[in-house]
Design a protein with these regions (language model features):
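Short, surface-exposed linear patches
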Residues: 91-95, 126-130, 180
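Compact, glycine/acidic-enriched structural inserts
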Residues: 180-190
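Surface-exposed beta-strand edges and their flanking turn/coil or helix-capping segments
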Residues: 84, 119, 150, 172-174, ...
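A short, terminal or domain-edge coil/loop segment
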Residues: 121-131, 156-171, 188-202
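PLD-like (HKD) phosphodiesterase/transphosphatidyltransferase domain
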Residues: 2-106, 189-254
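Short acidic, S/G/P-rich loop/turn micro-motifs used as interaction or catalytic elements
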Residues: 73-89, 109-118, 141-143, 164
Length: 254
């Protein structure tokens, strides 16, 4: 199977309620104990880079701020994924952030191989389904000699830099300084303004919005491409439709 087929199958099979039950999301308690880190700290090397990511999540979850979070990274994940505990801790921190009720604007880097991009999106599906994440992407990004990371919340900012191919020699900087957080927030806002929406997630509370969009869309000329988990109802033959209606005891009037 190609990566797109696998991605669509995962999307079709995903059940948010089942996922919430598996990770005990309903039972998660957002800690209220203040997280003590220096006003700012610099991190070096892969092991400290992983620590910086978790420290940012801790600082965000344990602060009183409920401001939205903006995240962008074109840093490779391969080295960090070698540590089996890091992805678990990172996902737990993300779950706590969503449990706190924070909204996340995730700017994806699509300058990756198609397979890697599909794999990345697959890992984000569970969090997308909460409706608290708005995914974006940057157009016209090209291979760059520099790697960057920028994550900003209402209470902390994490900035990272490295040379392509030498992630292990990069530097990450975490700050809680109000002035610096404001600076990084401006940068994140400007980056978000340059990004385009990757997808819209409609949950039950946005049903009216979805219906409005679908009705408006029917009035626009042009080609459509729909990817569905089963054939749409309008492809059914009249004979099969009649048999189904009769089986369910529905008369012509109904």
């Amino acid at each position: 199977k190609d990566s797109m087929t696998v991605f669509l199958e995962k999307l079709d099979e995903f059940n948010l309620n089942e996922y919430i039950h598996i990770i005990h999301f309903d039972e998660l308690k957002v800690p209220s104990v203040p997280f003590q880190i220096p006003t700012s700290r610099t991190y070096w090397g892969i092991s400290e880079v992983m620590e910086s990511e978790l420290d940012f999540l801790k600082a965000t979850v344990l602060s009183k701020s409920t401001a939205p979070v903006i995240m962008y990274s074109d840093m490779p994940m391969k080295e960090m994924a070698k540590d089996p505990e890091f992805p678990k801790k990172w996902m737990f921190g993300m779950a706590l952030m969503l449990k706190k009720g924070l909204h996340l604007y995730q700017i994806h880097n699509l300058d990756r191989s198609f397979d890697e991009m599909m794999l990345g999106l697959e890992s984000w599906i569970p969090m997308y389904m909460t409706g608290q994440i708005s995914p974006y992407y940057l157009k016209n990004t090209q291979s760059n000699p520099f790697l960057h990371l920028l994550k900003v919340s209402g209470s902390a900012a994490l900035s990272g830099e490295a040379i392509t191919g030498y992630h292990e020699n990069g530097k990450y900087y975490l700050t809680k300084s109000k002035r610096e957080v404001e600076y990084y927030h401006r940068r994140a806002d400007e980056l978000l303004k340059n990004a385009d929406s990757l997808m819209e997630i409609y949950r039950s509370d946005r049903e009216a919005e979805l219906n409005t969009f679908l009705i408006a869309d029917t009035r626009k000329s042009g080609k459509r491409r729909g990817i569905r988990s089963t054939l749409p109802l309008y492809t059914i033959s009249e004979e099969l439709l009649e048999r189904i209606l009769i089986r369910h005891g529905m008369d012509n009037r109904q």
